[in-house]
Curated annotation (Swiss-Prot):
Homooctamer. It is found in: Cytoplasm. GO terms for cellular component: cytoplasm. It is an enzyme of class 6 (ligase). It catalyses: L-glutamate + NH4(+) + ATP = L-glutamine + ADP + phosphate + H(+). It comes from Kluyveromyces lactis (strain ATCC 8585 / CBS 2359 / DSM 70799 / NBRC 1267 / NRRL Y-1140 / WM37). This is Glutamine synthetase.
Length: 372
């Protein structure tokens, strides 16, 4: 992909510095989620190779600069929860995913991982698996959809989904680089494909069990933004980045429990769908901002106002794959979540609805903490 913007990083110059001996020191890049559902990070030096998340030190940052704390009491603490090999610095360097905590020992109001983790721990015997399909759209540095004609539009949708060839796919180099970065880091990325709208792509992560699902999606998003940064391309997770006859972007959520995956599991899939039907509005609140622009009943979506389910129906709220219906066990797909979801909220409320509420966790109240 040719890039003309001088904002593009000069990685060919950087390379000779990346090859320098670090003299036993390790660089740990701490990553966290900010008040807008974006990602922030900063690096620190450690004096030895990290083998356990428990050995990672806590850190802090200025929460008043990220919308997570007032200026008069701005320290927010970073508590490491997972780490991954760093695909950019490589060697023994790592990327650390961290939760945000207030100085009074409470989780920051934008830290939804803490609440979701309680649900997964309570229902660990259910062995809940997820697979998330992250759709996104690429823009150039001037906020035009990448590869689209200046001041115009490409041909209508049709040839772009899983397309091959110039004029049908755009920025494949970005996508391939991201794919390799995830594999290197041990993210359970299971596939990629070009989507229905040109310059819209999707990657899938999973199956992952419990809280690890959202952890891995967040770190995969971080890698995507970092890769795109090097190519001078912007990543949008907006569920309807372009008005008109263009597909929106979602984060379809595939769900199963141990009982659903066993022979005869269709009964448990149907039970779960019945439970979901009774909490449709509660789920929708947690399924991403601006999702009403996407869930219109068009462009392979269900209507936001009604709950529906069906076999192989991509216009339903919940889709049962035809192969699952034939075999009588497996998983189901919730097609309602938008591309900009917080996966901790979505997987957490899914666990709460399917497996049961617990006394000390409530995902709806957890989401509402953001506005307090």
């Amino acid at each position: 992909m040719a890039a003309t913007s001088d904002i593009v990083e000069k990685t060919h110059i950087l390379q000779k510095y990346l090859e320098l001996d670090q003299r036993g020191a390790i660089i740990a890049e701490y990553v966290w989620i900010d008040s807008e559902g974006g990602l922030r990070s900063k690096g620190r030096t450690l004096n030895k190779k990290v083998t356990s998340v428990d050995s990672l030190p806590e850190w802090n940052f200025d929460g008043s600069s990220t919308g997570q704390a007032p200026g008069h009491d701005s320290d927010i603490y970073l508590k490491p929860v997972a780490f991954y090999p760093d695909p950019f610095r490589r060697g023994d360097n790592i990327v650390v995913l961290a939760e945000c905590w207030n100085n009074d020992g409470t989780p920051n109001k934008f830290n939804h991982r803490h609440e979701a983790a309680k649900l997964f721990e309570a229902h660990k015997d259910a062995e809940m698996w997820f697979g998330l399909e992250q759709e996104y759209t690429l823009f150039d540095q001037y906020d035009q959809v990448y590869g689209w004609p200046k001041g115009g539009f490409p041909a209508p949708q049709g040839p772009y989904y899983c397309g091959v060839g110039a004029g049908k796919v755009f920025a494949r180099d970005v996508i391939e680089a991201h794919y390799r970065a995830c594999l290197y880091a041990g993210v359970n990325i299971s596939g990629i494909n070009a989507e229905v709208m040109p310059s819209q792509w999707e990657f899938q992560v999973g199956p992952c069990e419990g809280i690890a699902m959202a952890d891995q999606l967040w770190i995969a998003r971080y890698f995507l933004h970092r890769v795109a940064e090097e190519f001078g391309v912007k990543v949008s997770l907006h569920p309807k980045p372009l008005k008109g006859d263009w597909n929106g972007a979602g984060c379809h959520t595939n769900v199963s429990t141990k009982l659903m995956r066993a022979p005869g599991g269709m009964k448990y899939i149907e039970d779960a769908i019945e439970k979901l039907s009774k909490r449709h509005n509660e789920h929708i609140k947690l399924y991403g901002a601006d999702n009403e622009q996407r869930l219109t009943g068009r462009h392979e979506t269900a209507s936001m106002s009604t709950f529906s389910s069906g076999v192989a129906n991509r216009g339903a709220s919940i889709r049962i794959p035809r192969s699952v219906n034939k075999e009588g066990y497996g998983y189901f797909e919730d097609r309602r979540p938008a591309s900009n979801i917080d996966p901790y909220l979505v997987t957490g409320i899914m666990c709460e609805t399917v497996c049961g509420a617990i006394e000390n966790a409530n995902m709806t109240k957890e989401y509402e903490r953001e506005s307090l």
